Structures are given as C-alpha cells and as structure tokens.
C-alpha cells in the first residue's frame, strides 16, 4: 500500500519528474462507475482484468466497497466446460456474498444493478450473472454515458475495459 506508493514517488523524485497525483485502481474505477449511477441508488461495478477482478460498490459518487476477486477475464476466456462452470459459480458466489454483506452493513443503500467491464468478450458471462444474481446485470458501454469522438476505438467494450483505469484517472476531480 503506502510503502509501494512511497517507493514509486521516490523513483519519480530521483528522476526529477514532478507528480501531480497518484491514483489507485479502486478510485479510478469509482470515477467510471459514477457515470453509471442513478440518483439515490447504489451501483456494483465489476471489472474483469487480465490478472484478477475488482468489484466496487459506489453511492453518490463515493466508494463504499472495493474487493478483489481471484477470477480474471483471461482465465474465464480460456476455461472450457466444467472448469469454466466452476469459475463462474465461484464468481457468482463471491458476488452474492459481497452484495448480501453490503446490504446488511449499508441497508440505507439500495444496489440496483451491476455493471460488468471485461477485457475479453463476455456475453455468455453477462447472461450467467444475470441468471444468478438478484440485481440486473449490464455490460459497461461508455458510449451510453460519455462521448469520445476523437477515440473511435472506445466504441468497443473490450477496449473500454482495457482502458478503464486510464479513463477513470482522467475523470478524477480536483486537479490533474
């Protein structure tokens, strides 16, 4: 955590490269999730990365929960048959447990849906999550909430997911 950030800052200081800010993935994802929030409603946002997954729950633009899940987009895409089914069941169970615990701890926040961002094609996963979770599940589509005319490649959901952290960092308020 703080030690890793400190090491990174010292490297930049040593190279005389000024840093205006350092973002962490959880806050970058929060910034993107805020684009999909509904007023007075909580939003679960699951990003499937190449190494693992990050689940965040936001409300009013604030991050209330962040959790890493050891299931990656690549692992799911490469798995077949029974192995894929086991991974999906594990992911569903982790999501259900987290949503249930969140509901108990923050009963004043109603999580109304889960947005899924995946670096791999995941229509089949979207359907599986939708069948097994008690909240509606939708694919992240930044084109529905933002306009990127200078970046036509961001019309592709997988490219959006690949650039999720950079996009989230660019959306940070309060400075560079």
Task: Cite the ranges covered by each PLM segment.
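Hydrophobic/aromatic-enriched cytosolic interaction surfaces used to assemble or bind macromolecules
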Residues: 1-176
